[in-house]
Regions:
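Positively charged, polyanion-binding regions of nucleic-acid-associated proteins
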Residues: 2-25, 30, 48
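Eukaryotic low-complexity, proline/serine- and acidic-rich intrinsically disordered regions
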Residues: 4-7, 59-64, 75
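Charge-enriched amphipathic alpha-helical scaffolds
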Residues: 30, 34-66
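Short, cationic-aromatic polyanion-contact patches
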Residues: 64-82
C-alpha cells in the first residue's frame, strides 16, 4: 500500500470512530484508533500512518509520537478529507 492510500483509509476510520467537537471537526482518541480491530487489520504501522497524515496536514494531535497506553487519551482531530 502506498502512503496516500493509507492516509485516505485512516481518514475513513477517524470518521467512523470519531465524533464532532464544538468546532464541527471529527475527533477520536488515539486509544480508540489503536484498539479498534478493523484499524489493527488495516494498518501495519498505525503510528507511521498518523505521522504521515499529520505531515500532510490532514490531522492534528499534540506531540510528535503517540504510544499505546501512554497517549490513549490524546485527541486525533481530522482537519480535512482531501
Amino acid at each position: 500500500m502506498n502512503v496516500d492510500h493509507e492516509v485516505q483509509l485512516l481518514i475513513q476510520e477517524i470518521k467512523r470512530l470519531g465524533s464532532p467537537n464544538a468546532d464541527g471537526q471529527i475527533v477520536v482518541k488515539f486509544g480508540v484508533l489503536f484498539s479498534d480491530d478493523k484499524c489493527a487489520n488495516l494498518f501495519e504501522a498505525l503510528v507511521g500512518t498518523l505521522r504521515a497524515a499529520k505531515r500532510k496536514k490532514f490531522i492534528k494531535y499534540d506531540g510528535e509520537l503517540l504510544l499505546q497506553g501512554v497517549h490513549d487519551s490524546v485527541d486525533v482531530v481530522l482537519l480535512k478529507e482531501e
